Amino acid sequence: MCYSANGNTFLIVDNTQKRIPEEKKPDFVRENVGDLDGVIFVELVDGKYFMDYYNRDGSMAAFCGNGARAFSQYLIDRGWIKEKEFTFLSRAGEIKVIVDDSIWVRMPGVSEKKEMKVDGYEGYFVVVGVPHFVMEVKGIDELDVEKLGRDLRYKTGANVDFYEVLPDRLKVRTYERGVERETKACGTGVTSVFVVYRDKTGAKEVKIQVPGGTLFLKEENGEIFLRGDVKRCSEE
């Protein structure tokens, strides 16, 4: 079944019966991902739902923020979860979800943040489940994200996020590692940007414009929550 979280697209596969063994997952992903950004396997571990995320190239990732929102919506749509607050497991730890008029996902904590300079480009290396290189820019709409993002991605070993500060919001574009292209949205990417912006300005919530729409982030009691649009894009 296909889900889109602000244009970040995923194939979600019910693997609670272990029909697809671990060693077969990379091949399954490459053969079935099509033009989507990634594949999420729904697993059961000690009676709890586990989100097993793979990038479109078949590589495993510890976490995916928009994937977590899509995963949560999938569990709700299947009728497996009915509570307004619940948790599920991921390789980045236990993830908390709050459901009101939309889905808020508690993002993994920041395990690393440091200044980094690469080929004259200054930014921050931030890890929120997965690594990101975050850089502030001007004229983000004219930026060649495919070229510069690809160059920085291989030199930093991280996803690459460019952001511009606008009067009422931030604008973000991300080149994703493992997808190897710019995506319409990246949950851990906008979270990494929020962390950098928060530490610079003290902001506790922010609206972020991405190519796939608008995402919202807020910090409460030291925890960062993400929400945005999620919709089903196929019944398959």
From Swiss-Prot:
EC number of this enzyme: 5.1.1.7
Keyword entries, A-Z: Amino-acid biosynthesis, Cytoplasm, Isomerase, Lysine biosynthesis
Gene Ontology biological-process entries: lysine biosynthetic process via diaminopimelate
Name of the protein in its database record: Diaminopimelate epimerase
Temperature-related behavior of activity: Optimum temperature is 90 degrees Celsius.
Subunit structure: Probably forms homotrimers.
Active site: 64, 186
pH-activity relationship: Optimum pH is 7.5-8.0.
Reactions it catalyzes: (2S,6S)-2,6-diaminopimelate = meso-2,6-diaminopimelate
Pfam families: DAP_epimerase (PF01678)
PANTHER family in UniProt: DIAMINOPIMELATE EPIMERASE, DIAMINOPIMELATE EPIMERASE, CHLOROPLASTIC
Pathway stated in the Swiss-Prot or TrEMBL entry: Amino-acid biosynthesis; L-lysine biosynthesis via DAP pathway; DL-2,6-diaminopimelate from LL-2,6-diaminopimelate: step 1/1
Recorded family membership: Belongs to the diaminopimelate epimerase family.
Function: Catalyzes the stereoinversion of LL-2,6-diaminopimelate (L,L-DAP) to meso-diaminopimelate (meso-DAP), a precursor of L-lysine and an essential component of the bacterial peptidoglycan. Also catalyzes the racemization of certain amino acids, including Lys, with low efficiency.
The keyword Isomerase is annotated on this UniProt entry: yes
Keyword Ribonucleoprotein assigned: no
InterPro entries in the record: DAP_epimerase_AS, DAP_epimerase_DapF
Location relative to the cell: Cytoplasm
Lineage of origin: Bacteria, Thermotogati, Thermotogota, Thermotogae, Thermotogales
MF-aspect GO terms: diaminopimelate epimerase activity
Domain of life, source organism: Bacteria
